[in-house]
Amino acid sequence: MDKEHLKKNLQEKMEKALKVLDHELKGLRTGRASVNLLDSVTVEAYGSKMPLSQVASLSTPDARTINVQVWDKSMVSSVEKGITIANLGLTPATDGQLIRLPIPALTEERRTELVKLAHKYGEDTKISLRNIRRDGNEALKKLAKDNVIAKDEHHSLSEQVQKLTDDYSNKVDSVIKQKEQEIMTV
């Protein structure tokens, strides 16, 4: 593995960690209706568990409602059950094949819990960034030990890896801060 490949590999891994954080944060309720809230919902369908999006179409007609249009009439009760089991704090209101999910306003207490959860996701992401940095530094040490790179080049590359880690750590902080503002906005 050469140094350019190593840097590119580290950057790709850090980018993936940031994408995972984005995905986790989309699942946090902010008081506004978003079909992303239902990403974690699975439904017992045709003898197996399926994501809700594969048995129904999801839409947000307004800021406080999510509509779930179930395609197969026989699946309505299974979809309701899946939404309830997901423990999202949403109460399904069924009208034929249409399930309406009114989004209740978030209490101050719940907002604080969500902010703490967002910070936990951010910290988990920073831990994975540090692990990626550690792996990169170990690879650099191996390159230096095998005389593929000189000692001063090793030092320079280590600094670049640290700068990359710091940049992504700052991105995590900014994403978390933005999500915190979104959650706390009434």
Curated annotation (Swiss-Prot):
The keyword Protein biosynthesis applies. SUPFAM superfamilies: Ribosome recycling factor, RRF (SSF55194). Coiled coil: none annotated. One of its GO terms (cellular component) is cytosol. GO terms for biological process: cytoplasmic translational termination. The keyword Cytoplasm applies. It is found in: Cytoplasm. Keywords: Cytoplasm, Protein biosynthesis. Gene3D superfamilies: 3.30.1360.40, Ribosome-recycling factor (1.10.132.20). Its main location: cytoplasm. InterPro entries: Ribosome_recyc_fac, Ribosome_recyc_fac_dom, RRF_sf. One of its GO terms (molecular function) is ribosomal large subunit binding. It holds the Pfam family RRF. Responsible for the release of ribosomes from messenger RNA at the termination of protein biosynthesis. May increase the efficiency of translation by recycling ribosomes from one round of translation to another. Belongs to the RRF family. This is Ribosome-recycling factor. The gene is frr.
